[in-house]
Amino acid sequence: MDQTSSSTQILVSLMENAQPDPTAGQPVAQVILDNFCLSSMYSPDVLRNPRAQHTIKTAVFQWIDEHHRKMYDCPIEPPLRFTDDAHLSADRCWHHLIGKLERVVSVLRAMRAMSRFEHNVFVFLPYCKRLRALVELFRHDYCCQSTVAGCARALDETIADAQRHLLVVRSMSERAAVMLVFSDWVRVYQCNICEDSSAEEQFLKPNVCCGYRVCNACYAKLWEFCTGAYPVCPICKTGFKSSSSNKRLQKADDPATL
């Protein structure tokens, strides 16, 4: 039995063994929320931390690669891996990628049919967009047009489905943001001088005197425009003295700093 027929049988088996959907009739938002497969990777700064985001996306690719190994007995090869440079040099032939792209698309199709990923299709979106860009490079090749078109169609369907799910996720996020206004969980750090605000605690200079909140940008301006040896707190007139090793607090005894 050749590799193609073997992988086809695996795909058919996965589709036939799919369990009935126990979530039928439930609101889509609730189904997505209850079945999200990456909840354990939460961190407080996940929306503002590119490294954390990359780690999560890489974890999804590792799942895809694992299923590719099961279906084809080999890992996904460069440059089709999520962490590879997507740029293809024009001074060499890349036609061999078409067959490999088709195999990866088959893996994604099989995973979409699994109950674990049925309501998590949006986690495949970054990788699908990457594959779609690679498929487009072969769109006008003389041969293999049906294979390329089939890959493009499958990826377009997955991307469209993922984006529909993300519209629901965005709606949930917007509602949750308003709901959390009534809780003490979400803190907003606001500068008393410029009145800019941030969700990051590091946005404000550490409190070392009366609690008057000063952001780091305004703190830098206080140093820039101070007329004495060092700037003072606008409220309690406590002086901020800096040394080469650290920043420490000193009560402004010198009249020039008042």
UniProtKB/Swiss-Prot annotation:
A zinc finger (RING-type) spans 191-237. The keyword Glycosyltransferase does not apply. Keywords: Early protein, Metal-binding, Zinc, Zinc-finger. The keyword Transcription does not apply. It comes from the Viruses. It holds the Pfam family Baculo_IE-1. GO terms for molecular function: zinc ion binding. This is Immediate-early protein IE-0. It comes from Lymantria dispar multicapsid nuclear polyhedrosis virus.
